[in-house]
């Protein structure tokens, strides 16, 4: 488990940030050697603001190109700046595609990955004859006809506790591939927009994008809704559909239970 800091207990406080970002220009959340990330920008700007080395820990390490309305990060600091004021000062330093929605002090032993939580992701699809430029960074474009009823039927079969190994990127190192999905909704918004909304207690690497790719296959008639059961039973990545592109995915909400 990652440690937040080695600062003396009496001198530090722990601060939780709610972070929104457009992931288009970033190599994901986690620090990488080959590009700028959300985590590296937060560390850089917090270190500059608080005049001490700061390293944040993120609740969800989103992939390159994925967006967020409410990811969570925490860090320790000895600064006397009130926790609730940090959001205002930090937003003055961050790039315009990253914004802190809230900053607050939390108990010193609070850690985002040790808490029971509920995450909600949305995968957005734009269906039309031609692409819409203003949606190109946040929705997957398709000109295929999609049978939404078939997608909704298949989505319901994913709900509950299952072994989602077939929906996990090959090579991912995890102790268990069992997860609980509270709900999977396929919702039409207007004539052209379609949203796949998935809520669960945790997700495997690329799991939501593989779910989206599989539901798209079903919507196009390439698979039957009942194939979900066969895919789950296979426990093999090759049994599921393709991994949908990252730019259609947004982490909408992170709730601690």
Roles of regions detected by a PLM:
Residues 1-257:
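Structured-RNA-binding interfaces characteristic of tRNA pseudouridine synthases
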